[in-house]
Amino acid sequence: MSNNFKRTDRIAEMIQRKLALIIPQEIKDPRLKGFVTISAVKVAADLGHAKIYFTVLNEDKSVVTNILNGAASYLRSALARSITLRTVPQLHFIYDESIEYGQRLSRLIDEVNPPDSSSDDNN
């Protein structure tokens, strides 16, 4: 069997696509004003649990994490209606800090190597 992707990877990708559609449509919490983006999904080998990594713009990440984890059982049932799996994994939402980390590194690089404006003045 020479599949390029494992079954868990295919399921994770499907869950990511479906949740990206379900969350904006189904979550009506007034505290959730920002735009939630699902950045990655990691599914356990036994398909019992799924870690959902997300980012959010202009919102408190701990509040959004609590909202999403509070709605996890509802999102799981909405997900079960839209996909065909024997069992839908339990969802655990985790804030993805990789984007903030990348922005922080970019700022540090810009501080160390500022744009050379003096060469523009000499030309």
UniProtKB/Swiss-Prot annotation:
Keyword Nucleus: no
Compartment annotation: Cytoplasm
GO aspect biological process, one term: maturation of SSU-rRNA
UniProt-listed InterPro entries: KH_dom-like_a/b, RbfA, RbfA_dom_sf, Ribosome-bd_factorA_CS
GO cellular component, one term: cytosol
Keywords, alphabetical: Cytoplasm, Ribosome biogenesis
GO molecular function terms noted in the UniProt entry: ribosomal small subunit binding
Keyword RNA-binding belongs to the record: no
Function recorded in the entry: One of several proteins that assist in the late maturation steps of the functional core of the 30S ribosomal subunit. Associates with free 30S ribosomal subunits (but not with 30S subunits that are part of 70S ribosomes or polysomes). Required for efficient processing of 16S rRNA. May interact with the 5'-terminal helix region of 16S rRNA.
PANTHER family attached to this UniProt entry: RIBOSOME-BINDING FACTOR A, CHLOROPLASTIC-RELATED (PTHR33515:SF1)
Recorded family membership: Belongs to the RbfA family.
Assembly notes: Monomer. Binds 30S ribosomal subunits, but not 50S ribosomal subunits or 70S ribosomes.
NCBIfam families to which the protein is assigned, alphabetical: rbfA
Name under which the protein is recorded: Ribosome-binding factor A
Organism of origin: Legionella pneumophila subsp. pneumophila (strain Philadelphia 1 / ATCC 33152 / DSM 7513)
Organism placement in taxonomy: Bacteria, Pseudomonadati, Pseudomonadota, Gammaproteobacteria, Legionellales
Gene that encodes the chain: rbfA
